[in-house]
A protein has these predicted regions:
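Ankyrin-repeat inter-repeat connecting loop/turn
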Residues: 50, 84, 114-117, 147, ...
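Ankyrin-repeat-protein effector appendages
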Residues: 21-28, 113, 143, 176, ...
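Intrinsically disordered, low-complexity regulatory segments in ankyrin-centric signaling systems
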Residues: 2-5, 20-48, 55-58, 211-226
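Ankyrin repeat boundary/linker residues
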Residues: 54, 88, 118-121, 151, ...
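Ankyrin repeat structural motif
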Residues: 36-44, 69-78, 103-111, 133-141, ...
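Ankyrin repeat A-helix N-terminal signature
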Residues: 30-35, 63-69, 97-103, 127-133, ...
């Protein structure tokens, strides 16, 4: 009888715990979508994991960026438990999303949280170059973003800037030494990307930069030494 009572109490405690967790799960994501910062903060203080994913695999921070829910973004970024590098199903990190949207202040905050500037596949620099976010591109490069990073199909930031970004974005990448000769899996260079969308001025700019590099005098060592 005693064992039966103990087992019953144990099952009740477990059931109550699961119910509480389910309630917190729903409350958290409802608060995130509604930009209810106080509710999110309260849940975190009670031990809710900010890195929990919803039924679609999205974290609270990713959802807050999408909505957007700016107050909740601040709460989550300020939480030491938040992993700012967790990506969505498309392998997009919070830094990538902030970069393509031109959210400079958020990019700065994420970098202060040690958000990864470089990663396998598409990178924040690809995204910033795509939308011509010059200031963010400079910040990423200053934080050692790999300028010739390749996406899964071999596309570089210069290629994305050539097709979708601004001429200033292309100019910046060229000035910083982006490789003009690289090709993606289809054998296309940055010039090909520009020509594909009839951006002849951009194609000419890249071609001129490549020619200038090819004709640049080679460094000569002094007295036989570098």
């Amino acid at each position: 009888m005693k064992n039966y009572i103990k087992k019953s109490i144990y099952l009740i405690v477990i059931a109550t715990s699961f119910a509480a967790q389910a309630g917190s799960f729903e409350d958290f994501f409802r608060a995130v979508r509604g930009d209810n910062a106080s509710s999110v903060r309260s849940l975190l203080q009670r031990g809710f994991d900010p890195n929990t994913r919803d039924e679609h695999g999205q974290t609270g921070l990713l959802i807050a960026l999408r909505e957007p829910s700016p107050k909740v973004i601040q709460v989550l970024i300020e939480s030491p438990q938040t992993n700012v590098d967790l990506a969505n199903a498309k392998d997009e990190t919070p830094l990538m999303l902030a970069a393509i949207k031109g959210q400079q202040d958020l990019v700065t905050q994420l970098l202060k949280c040690d958000a990864a500037v470089n990663k396998t596949g598409w990178t924040p620099l690809h995204y910033a170059a795509t939308s011509g976010q010059l200031t963010i591109m400079k910040v990423l490069l200053d934080n050692y973003a790999f300028i010739d990073a390749q996406s899964p199909n071999g596309t570089t930031p210069l290629m994305m800037a050539a097709m979708y970004g601004s001429s200033e974005a292309v100019k910046l990448l060229l000035a910083e030494g982006a490789d003009t000769t690289m090709k993606n899996q289809l054998g296309m260079t940055a010039v090909d990307f520009a020509n594909k969308v009839n951006r002849s001025d951009t194609a000419a700019m890249i071609t001129a930069a490549a020619a200038a590099r090819a004709n640049a005098p080679k460094a000569i060592p002094k007295d036989g030494k570098w």
